[in-house]
């Protein structure tokens, strides 16, 4: 019997990536989120493909085509809600995956980490253009407000915005191109994910201790295939719970009103997974300053390897850094809450303080605390 996994050029790649891959014996459930993100991506591409078969990217018919999908297409409602809530699951897994990387020092794999940050940006861009497609009130005004931010770029800003819009306002041309972007970007994400994996398999996985695990490796299959399968079952259970019992819980009621350029909603806000960045944007009164802070809030992740001053890779044995990490998590949850609140006292002040704390922890406190821990180890 010929072992195809060892002889076929194609199966050899699959074998080396998912079957005979040497993996650390002590990686915890925090390492499950990579495979869960892969499942989310496949799920989003499949549900999105079926939605695209019935969706029309025209300002006159977009809203009614989504209604038609929910009412008239066989199981259209479940496909639509799996796609909408699948995006939320995608971002939950994404944030936990990035959080795991920060906590256990996985950012020292430079290529893997930088591709990951690019992936994060691409997924955020995909989610943004996708939110515009149902052409509800929040879709239209969200697109108007966020694309308008580019006008803060000196000299070329206004031209850039009009170029993205395809006119002098968000209209038919904008919706058509956003649909095109939303269709192509997931395939770019899939390609980037493969590059992400390629670089990861060059070094091998990190583990909770941050210590090299070459001395104790186990094959990926069956140990981690079983472990990942459990994670996938739980993910799908949680997603279906959301889809079947509370499909609109994470959405905005304003998006059930067709887009109207003459009527601005009282509170324009993005989906929940962008609220932390939106709160940082709003906390700065200056337009350009806000845009820079918004970009910096994600781009700051690229600096993580440079800001690592500890002699230990992981936070597992660094209690002070752990405290700071969980303060950062609490701060991000506070920013998420603030992003959904109206622009008035006391929310503005809380948002400004939380934004300052976010940058303060990452840029200043983390490196200082790490250095203090290094000195304490000398005792």
UniProtKB/Swiss-Prot annotation:
The keyword Mitochondrion applies. Heme b b562 binds at residues 83, 182. It is a multi-pass membrane protein. InterPro entries: Cyt_b/b6_C (IPR005798), Cyt_b/b6_C_sf (IPR036150), Cyt_b/b6_N (IPR005797), Cytb/b6-like_sf (IPR027387), Cytochrome_b (IPR030689), Cytochrome_b_C_euk/bac (IPR048260), Cytochrome_b_N_euk/bac (IPR048259), Di-haem_cyt_TM (IPR016174). It is found in: Mitochondrion inner membrane. Heme b b566 binds at residues 97, 196. It comes from the Eukaryota. GO terms for biological process: mitochondrial electron transport, ubiquinol to cytochrome c. One of its GO terms (cellular component) is respiratory chain complex III. PROSITE patterns: CYTB_CTER, CYTB_NTER. A ubiquinone binds at residue 201. Heme 1 (or BL or b562) is low-potential and absorbs at about 562 nm, and heme 2 (or BH or b566) is high-potential and absorbs at about 566 nm. This is Cytochrome b. The gene is MT-CYB.
